[in-house]
Amino acid sequence: MVMYMNGVLHDIFPKESDIPTEYQLADIHQTEYLINGEIRHWKGPMQEVRSPIFIRTGNGLEQKRLGSYPLMGEKEAMEALRAAVEAYSNGRGKWPAMSVADRIDHVKEFVGRMKKQRQEMVKLLMWEIGKSRHHSETEFDRTIAYINDTIEAVKELDRLSSRFTSEEGVIGQI
């Protein structure tokens, strides 16, 4: 009975070649990172990323390898933090000083680029956290909707805060 169960359990996991092409995901090896507006190339240790989903291999069942990312340390973290603090510049940096309309334009551009990556993002969600395609698509679409709703809320807040009001004979802009 144990041998039978092991065989049945083993057989429910696909081989890599059994995975439909539209759901296959090439290894992603992220060697670049961004600090202070500069894309840098990491030459240090890497962290391997594996899916919670197992596949059948010649060595038995193994978690599907998804890729790797830089395993940075305190030095890089502090450098990134310093760059972020300098960029913010106590609210006088480029982004915080930018007009609401310009910030919205940048976020919209980001959303447009993100939408072009929808299928890849959906596959990543499927492999990284084991969601179904439908749930991964729903999560992606919900994220886009949330960003768009946030943009609309920021526009409304900006409109409301730009109004003139009159109180007790004093006219002022709020």
State the predicted function of each range.
Residues 1-2, 171:
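Short intrinsically disordered, low-complexity coil segments enriched in acidic
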Residues 2-127:
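Short, structured beta/alpha segment
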